[in-house]
Swiss-Prot record:
Coiled coil: none annotated. It is an enzyme of class 6 (ligase). The gene is ligA. This is DNA ligase. The active site is at 117 (n6-amp-lysine intermediate). The keyword Secreted does not apply.
């Protein structure tokens, strides 16, 4: 085969594979078997391996995944990916319709398009000359994270558009996982000893945020496209026409459940139908999106700061079920906090079997008046987290039992103390096995040291065999140690050891968060890392030095100094250092004209996003905070500013408009 023949055959294979992928994933009309598709794909891979110069940005081989990234890059959206206003009742839906007709000065029924509100992750796909060039998350609506390589691995996202596609097309869609695929994914993770995902949305979000796209490629992700940002050339006249155009271009659109309806009465009827049919769908939805169909009317209605006036999201009410509290067990966390958890007679809520529900603390138990044996109403708040919301006292038979406040730790029998102002008692025993287990789970978590492959089941086995007695022992584990754990094969053990070794040089902020210092979350851990620059400097910081930092109050200052004062913690830190754990130092924030100044942004900002505002302030040495206090130096007020603005006036704090703030920043940067 000469060069010209190779090029022709390669292009032919690309075209054939793209075509069959569209037929299978977008149109559900496969023409060849999976085996035939695999044969074509293998031929393509062999050609690319032999002649790498053939590979293009449109190659179907990109579905497999590319080289891992070190970090995601910011991607600005040419047009904001706006949020939607919510309607929680049918009355609010009628109010929305009344506003639309008032703005249009018309009494005639409005034509609406109704679409399913997928419970997934919003993304943007940018096609240039019909080829997928950039993919990103929604982010804050103005800027997302570049996840192009990950999105290319999703089979239902076309790498190349079909038909007479526009030169530029920005597509908005929702990435999700089918319920059956989600159950299968969690079962596989359980088998591997990995932490399971809480729900399909979390699984989709976690899959998209993988730095290694080969991991994303293994996840059963799908997409439904629902709108556009920019479109070159002629625009369709209506939203439903736009959906049909997108479908013709090879994009996956949920036409099956989209409806074009005349007037709000038809819309509310369809909303009721969806609520009844919700459990029949193969994926999670949390409502219905209603849009004015006429695109010219959409432009006339325009947008508010964060939401379009021409669309609304009708949210389903939380789904509930009635069951029985079979027991109330006590759970010990990494800080020693003892929390009550209701063990329930298994019941299905929102398509998920629920057998446990949080009771939070004994104040909540008293408020609900819940006893062991009670019949209760359980709700998955946001269709995710189970909660007991009501006790049906009329079902009591006198056999119910209360759960007293524990006098000793249920895990180790050690002393328990309930401090003034706190709602839960705490185990005081540092060697408590339950505290150790939870501390290690926190230490290895993705947002902390990110030790992939060290799941809850493996941690339990390592503790049971006494192979680890502190987080420092993780770094002394051998392959032989790991092979003692059930369901941990040779290859998995090697991968886990690699992940443990890679965690030794995590950024200081991540390391501080992993230590589990009480009251120090991700944000404060990052703040302390930037302020002090090294673990040694922070460990020697005085209470006064900590209090001098904005956002650090007495509670956090005491917690940090107490942590480094405890001999057990110093021993663990020394052991981590001996094991080669060396958190990457972060540069101490340099001074600037706003050093020591605290800013609060309130109201609807139109000139910049909150993230951009924070970056401007921090660039000049200042800090952005979320609340107004006596320590606040300046409040920047956007449209419809509320209680924060009022509090600033009461405290006589300087107040700036967005324009005045930008002028101040320009002046300081030019100085």
């Amino acid at each position: 085969m000469d060069k010209a023949q190779r090029i022709r055959r390669y292009q032919q294979l690309c075209d054939e594979l793209h075509r069959h992928s569209r037929l299978y994933y977008t149109y559900d009309r496969p023409e060849i078997t999976d085996a035939e598709y695999d044969r074509l794909f293998r031929e393509l891979l062999e050609l690319e391996k032999a002649y790498p110069e053939l590979v293009t940005a449109a190659s179907p081989s990109l579905r497999v995944g590319a080289s891992p990234l070190s970090q995601f890059t910011p991607v600005p959206h040419s047009r904001p990916m706006l949020s939607l206003e919510n309607a929680l009742t049918e009355d609010e839906l009628y109010d929305f319709d009344a506003r639309i007709r008032k703005l249009l000065a018309s009494d005639a029924p409005v034509r609406y398009v109704c679409e399913l509100k997928m419970d997934g992750v919003a993304v943007e796909l940018v096609y240039r000359d019909g080829i997928l060039s950039v993919g990103s998350t929604r982010g804050d609506g103005t800027t997302g994270e570049g996840i192009t390589e990950n999105l290319r691995t999703i089979p239902s996202i076309p790498l190349v558009l079909s038909g007479e596609a526009p030169a530029l097309l920005e597509v908005r869609g929702e990435v999700y996982i089918d319920l059956d695929d989600f159950q299968k994914l969690n079962h596989e993770r359980e088998e591997e000893g990995l932490q399971v995902f809480a729900n399909p949305r979390n699984a989709a979000a976690g899959s998209l945020r993988q730095l290694d796209s080969a991991v994303t490629a293994k996840r059963p992700l799908k997409i439904f496209c629902y709108g556009i940002g920019q479109l070159s050339g002629e625009h369709p006249a209506s939203h439903h026409s736009l959906l049909k155009c997108m479908h013709r271009w090879g994009l996956r659109v949920n036409l099956e459940h989209s409806r074009t309806l005349e007037g709000i009465e038809q819309v509310t009827d369809y909303f009721r139908q969806l609520q009844q049919r919700r459990d029949e769908l193969p994926y999670e939805i949390d409502g219905m999106v209603v849009k004015v169909d006429d695109l010219a009317l959409q432009r006339e209605l325009g947008e508010k700061t964060r939401t379009p006036r021409w669309a609304i999201a009708c949210k389903f009410p939380p789904r509930q079920a009635v069951t029985v509290v079979e027991d109330i067990v006590l759970q010990v966390g990494r800080t020693g906090a003892i929390t009550p958890v209701a063990q329930l007679k298994p019941v299905e809520v929102s398509g998920v079997t629920v057998s446990r529900a949080s009771l939070h603390n004994w104040d909540e138990i008293a408020r609900l008046d819940v006893l062991i044996g009670d019949t209760v109403v359980v709700e998955r708040a946001g269709d995710v987290i189970p909660d007991v919301v009501k006790v049906l006292t009329e079902h009591r038979n006198g056999q119910e039992r209360s759960v007293p406040l524990p006098q000793s730790c249920p895990a180790c029998g050690g002393p328990v103390v309930k401090l003034e102002g706190e709602v839960v008692p705490r185990c005081q025993e540092m060697s408590c096995p339950a505290r150790l287990r939870e501390s290690i789970k926190h230490f290895v978590a993705r947002r902390a040291m990110d030790i992939d492959g060290l799941g809850e089941r493996t941690i339990e086995q390592l503790l049971k065999r006494e192979l680890i007695k502190s987080v420092a022992d993780l770094y002394h584990l051998t392959k032989e140690d790991l092979l003692l754990c059930e369901r941990l094969a040779d290859k998995s053990a090697e991968k886990l050891l690699t992940a443990i070794a890679a965690s030794k040089t995590r950024p200081l902020g991540r390391f501080l968060f992993a230590l589990g210092i009480r009251h120090v979350g991700e944000h404060l851990a990052s703040l302390l890392a930037r302020q002090f620059g090294s673990l040694d400097a922070l460990s020697h910081a005085t209470r006064e030095e900590l209090l001098a930092i904005h956002e650090i109050g007495p509670q956090v200052a005491d917690s940090v100094t107490d942590f480094f004062a405890k001999s057990r913690n110093r021993e663990i830190l020394a052991a981590l250092q001996r094991a080669g754990v060396a958190p990457q130092a972060e540069e101490k924030r340099s001074g600037g004209p706003l050093t020591g100044k605290s800013f609060v942004f309130t109201g609807s900002l139109t000139r910049f996003s909150r993230k951009q505002a924070q970056e401007m302030v921090e660039r000049l040495g200042g800090r952005a905070s979320g609340s107004v206090s006596k320590k606040t130096d300046c409040v920047v007020a956007g449209e419809a500013a509320g209680s924060k603005l009022e509090k600033a006036r009461q405290l006589n704090i300087q107040i700036l408009s967005e324009e005045e703030f930008l002028q101040m920043i320009d002046t300081l940067e030019e100085a």
